[in-house]
Curated annotation (Swiss-Prot):
It is a multi-pass membrane protein. This is NAD(P)H-quinone oxidoreductase subunit 3. It catalyses: a plastoquinone + NADH + (n+1) H(+)(in) = a plastoquinol + NAD(+) + n H(+)(out); a plastoquinone + NADPH + (n+1) H(+)(in) = a plastoquinol + NADP(+) + n H(+)(out). The chain crosses the membrane at residues 6-26, 64-84, 89-109. It is found in: Cellular thylakoid membrane. It holds the Pfam family Oxidored_q4. Its EC number is 7.1.1.-. NDH-1 can be composed of about 15 different subunits; different subcomplexes with different compositions have been identified which probably have different functions. Belongs to the complex I subunit 3 family. One of its GO terms (cellular component) is plasma membrane-derived thylakoid membrane. It comes from Prochlorococcus marinus (strain NATL2A). The keyword Ribosomal protein does not apply.
Length: 120
């Protein structure tokens, strides 16, 4: 038979982590001012009212650079623990990391060849 012994702290944590946001949102709803007119409807950013419209089109190059950055940033997140435990992992982990790095180098070469890293 399945026993829940030892899970009391986990269950307590789940209950508290669910109750805290509910309590915070309920308290905010009860004590917040109800008025939705005038100054509350204005946009406020960095202490100044914005000038002009907010709907402008950004150049696609910004998104391409951001996407390439995120891909290689995630690569670093995956490779760091491997590098820390390199001596304990053995040859198989080394080969797996080489395959991972090879895939990313191929992706970088593809992005470079397609011009994703060119600004012009």
């Amino acid at each position: 038979m399945f026993s829940l012994q030892g899970y009391e702290y986990f269950l307590g944590f789940l209950l508290i982590s669910g109750a805290v946001p509910i309590l915070a949102l309920t308290t905010n709803k009860l004590i917040a001012p109800k008025s939705k007119a005038g100054e509350r409807q204005l946009t406020y950013e960095s202490g100044m009212e914005p000038i002009g419209g907010a709907w402008i089109q950004f150049n696609i190059r910004y998104y391409m650079f951001a996407l390439v950055f995120v891909i290689f940033d995630v690569e670093t997140v995956f490779l760091y623990p491997w590098a820390v435990a390199f001596h304990k992992l053995g040859l198989l982990a080394f080969i797996e990391a080489l395959v991972f790095i090879t895939i990313l180098v191929v992706a970088l070469a593809y992005a470079w060849r397609k011009g994703a890293l060119e600004w012009s």
